[in-house]
Design a protein with these regions (language model features):
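N-terminal post-signal-peptidase region of extra-cytosolic proteins
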Residues: 37-45
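Sequence context surrounding c-type heme c attachment/ligation sites in exported
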Residues: 67-171
Length: 171
């Protein structure tokens, strides 16, 4: 990000969406991929994707804490999945309450969130996953990425006013 407090993505962050997003307590999500300069993701004969070393998958989570106030939109966390030489690394950054900065979590954490939706107020524990928890879902069996896959990307996305099939746009 060029400005953490403003949530301004850097120019090399390519946004993408998924066809079947996972539910995370009503959190809004923004997804990005960063590829090393001159590198591409390739499709293998079995339909899976091969990511070059240095690829970074980014997912940011935010939540509207009070549906009466747009100003209550709060960034909660950003997760990074980084392609290394032999495997993937997982990193969760938890934003401070004001969203101006984020801290790398060494372990998982929980935070009680108070959310008002449709005149109903509820408090629930929001969970920030540890590296081990990330690796549980993002295993070799799931190709490490649950979202950046052919079946999830084969749909349209709005690229700053240009609506295009993601597989075409990302090619």
């Amino acid at each position: 990000f060029t400005d953490v407090a403003a949530g301004a993505p850097a120019a090399d962050l390519i946004p993408f969406g998924v066809n079947s997003p996972l539910w995370t307590d009503g959190a809004a999500k923004a997804r990005y991929v960063v590829l090393p300069p001159g590198e591409v993701v390739t499709r293998l004969p079995d339909g899976t994707l091969a990511f070059p070393v240095g690829t970074v998958l980014v997912k940011e989570f935010a939540m509207l804490l009070d549906d009466r106030r747009a100003s209550s939109f709060r960034r909660l966390e950003t997760r990074f999945v980084v392609r290394g030489q032999t495997d993937w690394g997982f990193f969760t950054y938890r934003y401070d309450e004001d969203g101006a900065d984020a801290q790398l979590l060494a372990t998982g954490a929980d935070e009680e969130l108070r959310v008002r939706r449709d005149a109903v107020v509820e408090t629930f524990p929001y969970h920030f996953p540890s590296r081990a928890e990330c690796a549980t879902c993002h295993s070799a069996a799931t190709e490490r990425s649950l979202g950046f896959r052919i079946d999830q990307l084969n749909g349209v996305f709005n690229y700053a006013g240009v609506i295009e099939n993601q597989l075409v746009a990302l090619n």
